[in-house]
C-alpha cells in the first residue's frame, strides 16, 4: 500500500526541522551553516536558499553543516554532502526519511560515516504555512553523518526521540 501525501505541492519541500531536534544536534555538532533553507526556516546564522543553488555552490562553513534536504529528490543532496564534507573539512549532518530500500541510501553508504536511526517515534516537522509541528509523518527519520579526516566507518547507531527531545527542550529552557 502506498501512502500519498496531502501536502500542497508548493509546501512539500519546505518543512522545517523542529527546534528541539536541531538544538539537541547543535549541542553535539556545533552547526554554522544550514545548506538547504529558506529565509523563513533557516536554523543557523548562515544559510543557503534555493536562490543560492546549493547543489551547484560551495558550502563554505566554519563549523558543522546542517541539511534537511527536499525529500522529493534526496540523492543529489547526498552526493553534494559527501563532496562538501571533504572540500569544507566539516562534518555534515543530514536528516532523511528512514528508508533503506532506496537508491540514495545505497549511495550514502559509499561515503557516510554514521547512520543514526531515531527510534521510538516519528518526527513532527514544522509545516511551512502554519509554523506549527504537524503530526502524521508517514516514516521514521534517520541522520546521515559525514565526518572529514577519517575513512567512512558506515556505523549504524540509534538514539531515541525522547532523548533528543529532552536535550533539545532543555536548551530552550536554559536560554
Question: Could you tell me what each predicted segment is?
Answer:
Residues 1-175:
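Class I S-adenosyl-L-methionine-dependent methyltransferase catalytic core
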